[in-house]
């Protein structure tokens, strides 16, 4: 039987605030166990939480960026369950009245536009961490307790694993552009649970869904969804029924396995958080946050095409990440050459980032220095070939391109008499090639250029070399 996959995603986005959601403890990653804690984190009697204003700001901005309705009045709620790494015995979250609802995200899959509706975006706190790899015992690290999260819940509008991955990548791009999260899936800043069901094609009624967890990359999201859909199809084709449960994705065995029976909302016994006042928003607050939103990729891409006259492909690559787009614009301010700047950022800069596995914020060559390098090429001070060598030195030096060129004697030679002398030597040393050129094998022009550049150690101005060589060959 032919089945249709129906997918809804629940994404937990860890916010990059300096302090936790309901207390002043640091959210710094990697601190020694149980050092970023306080009586509020540890649920000591008599402690009271206070909502971090930055968390509310991040929630509203993400809601605005995803076309949500922002609630004028919303409340926090207690989500009750027992787990060793949850000292309170409940998690502060939102239930009936979330801060954001009824939004949507638009994205492309293989060039085709798609739109996925959002049920809600709500604020909640993270639980602690259980550590199982120290001897035979289990230990608890409460550092993560209270770290702020936003949960983004989609409608079951997604119809393929590839579409789910594209949706997730778009959401990641949005939170990174907003600056509310680093969106790092491998480190758990963006955690995705997929609710997956299948139904016969053409049928409206939804099938029984399973929730799949433990997917820490876009590729694992795709593979887990594909596997789970195939597993459910095999169960139904064999005459069985799909069990509503939570399953864990095993990236080593490339399969899902049962984790626990799927909980329902009533299992958590939600009720309003009595220790926190309701969240009230107004038009002036929303207007303020709306004005602080960044220029998002689609608009920035269109502006790059019109303002800088660069190809659509270039603009698309440069605007995937906000920091890359910023870097490009800062470079153009110095170089005053958008296309050359685009070529360098898309080529040598992105290549180096990939090779060194670093983010642009850690890239050692600042836009100012790259812009200066491009300017030196434009002025004819150095050739593109020499510029590549200068760029490599800039990666491990704080010197300016001009300083490197002067120190290493890399300035381009444009002196016509010096170049004429070398070209004469090349032609004199290549009688056979010269005769073949005269006979019509004009592709040997490149050979003469190469020999000239080799003798001048790449310092000759290519434009001047071409002009003089053309003149000499025509009169030979």
Swiss-Prot record:
<dbReference type="InterPro" id="IPR006075">
    <property type="entry name" value="Asn/Gln-tRNA_Trfase_suB/E_cat"/>
</dbReference>
<keyword id="KW-0436">Ligase</keyword>
<dbReference type="InterPro" id="IPR018027">
    <property type="entry name" value="Asn/Gln_amidotransferase"/>
</dbReference>
<dbReference type="InterPro" id="IPR004413">
    <property type="entry name" value="GatB"/>
</dbReference>
<dbReference type="InterPro" id="IPR023168">
    <property type="entry name" value="GatB_Yqey_C_2"/>
</dbReference>
<comment type="subunit">
    <text>Heterotrimer of A, B and C subunits.</text>
</comment>
<dbReference type="GO" id="GO:0050567">
    <property type="term" value="F:glutaminyl-tRNA synthase (glutamine-hydrolyzing) activity"/>
</dbReference>
<dbReference type="InterPro" id="IPR014746">
    <property type="entry name" value="Gln_synth/guanido_kin_cat_dom"/>
</dbReference>
<keyword id="KW-0547">Nucleotide-binding</keyword>
<dbReference type="InterPro" id="IPR017959">
    <property type="entry name" value="Asn/Gln-tRNA_amidoTrfase_suB/E"/>
</dbReference>
<dbReference type="GO" id="GO:0006412">
    <property type="term" value="P:translation"/>
</dbReference>
<dbReference type="GO" id="GO:0070681">
    <property type="term" value="P:glutaminyl-tRNAGln biosynthesis via transamidation"/>
</dbReference>
<dbReference type="Pfam" id="PF02637">
    <property type="entry name" value="GatB_Yqey"/>
</dbReference>
<comment type="similarity">
    <text>Belongs to the GatB/GatE family. GatB subfamily.</text>
</comment>
<keyword id="KW-0648">Protein biosynthesis</keyword>
<dbReference type="Pfam" id="PF02934">
    <property type="entry name" value="GatB_N"/>
</dbReference>
<dbReference type="GO" id="GO:0005524">
    <property type="term" value="F:ATP binding"/>
</dbReference>
<dbReference type="GO" id="GO:0050566">
    <property type="term" value="F:asparaginyl-tRNA synthase (glutamine-hydrolyzing) activity"/>
</dbReference>
<dbReference type="InterPro" id="IPR042114">
    <property type="entry name" value="GatB_C_1"/>
</dbReference>
<comment type="function">
    <text>Allows the formation of correctly charged Asn-tRNA(Asn) or Gln-tRNA(Gln) through the transamidation of misacylated Asp-tRNA(Asn) or Glu-tRNA(Gln) in organisms which lack either or both of asparaginyl-tRNA or glutaminyl-tRNA synthetases. The reaction takes place in the presence of glutamine and ATP through an activated phospho-Asp-tRNA(Asn) or phospho-Glu-tRNA(Gln).</text>
</comment>
<keyword id="KW-0067">ATP-binding</keyword>
<dbReference type="InterPro" id="IPR003789">
    <property type="entry name" value="Asn/Gln_tRNA_amidoTrase-B-like"/>
</dbReference>
<protein>
    <recommendedName>
        <fullName>Aspartyl/glutamyl-tRNA(Asn/Gln) amidotransferase subunit B</fullName>
        <ecNumber>6.3.5.-</ecNumber>
    </recommendedName>
</protein>
């Amino acid at each position: 039987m032919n089945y249709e996959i129906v997918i809804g995603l629940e994404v937990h986005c860890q916010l990059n605030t300096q302090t936790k959601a309901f207390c002043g403890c640091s959210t710094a990653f990697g601190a020694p166990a149980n050092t970023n804690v306080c009586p509020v984190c540890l649920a000591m009697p008599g402690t009271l939480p206070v909502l971090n204003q930055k968390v509310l700001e991040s929630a509203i901005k993400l809601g605005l960026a995803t076309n949500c309705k922002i609630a004028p009045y919303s409340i926090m709620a207690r989500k009750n369950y027992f787990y060793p790494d949850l000292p309170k015995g409940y998690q502060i979250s939102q239930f009936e009245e979330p801060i954001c609802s009824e939004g949507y995200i638009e994205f492309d899959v293989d060039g085709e536009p798609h739109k996925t509706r959002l049920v809600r975006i709500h604020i909640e706190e993270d639980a602690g961490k259980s550590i199982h790899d120290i001897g035979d015992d289990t230990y608890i690290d409460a550092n993560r307790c209270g770290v702020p999260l936003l949960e983004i819940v989609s409608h079951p509008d997604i119809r393929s694993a590839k579409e789910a991955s594209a949706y997730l990548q778009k959401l990641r791009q949005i939170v990174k552009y907003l600056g509310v999260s680093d969106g790092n899936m491998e480190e758990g800043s963006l955690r995705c649970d997929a609710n997956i069901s299948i139904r016969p094609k053409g049928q409206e009624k939804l099938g029984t869904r399973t929730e799949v967890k433990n997917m820490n990359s876009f590729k694992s999201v795709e593979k887990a969804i594909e596997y789970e859909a195939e597993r459910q199809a095999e169960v139904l084709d064999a005459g069985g029924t799909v069990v509503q449960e939570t399953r864990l994705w095993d990236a080593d065995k490339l399969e899902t396995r049962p984790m626990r029976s799927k909980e329902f909302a009533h299992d958590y016994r939600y009720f309003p958080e009595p220790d926190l006042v309701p969240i009230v928003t107004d038009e002036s607050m929303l207007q303020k946050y709306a004005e602080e939103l960044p220029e998002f990729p689609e608009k920035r891409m269109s502006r790059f095409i019109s303002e800088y006259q660069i190809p659509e492909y270039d603009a698309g690559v440069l605007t995937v990440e906000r920091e890359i787009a910023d870097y490009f614009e800062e470079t153009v301010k110095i170089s005053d050459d958008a296309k050359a700047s685009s070529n360098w950022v898309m080529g040598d800069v992105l290549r180096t980032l990939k090779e060194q596995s670093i983010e642009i914020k850690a890239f050692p060559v600042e836009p100012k220095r790259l812009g200066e390098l491009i300017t030196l090429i434009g002025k004819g001070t150095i050739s593109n070939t020499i510029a590549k060598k200068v760029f490599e030195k800039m990666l491990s030096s704080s010197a300016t391109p001009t300083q490197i060129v002067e120190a290493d004697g890399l300035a381009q030679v444009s002196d016509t008499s010096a170049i004429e002398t070398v070209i004469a030597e090349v032609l004199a040393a290549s009688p056979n090639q010269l005769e073949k050129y005269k006979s019509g094998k004009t592709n040997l022009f490149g050979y003469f250029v190469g020999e000239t550049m080799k003798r001048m150690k790449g310092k000759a101005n290519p434009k001047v070399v071409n002009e003089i060589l053309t003149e000499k060959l025509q009169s030979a």
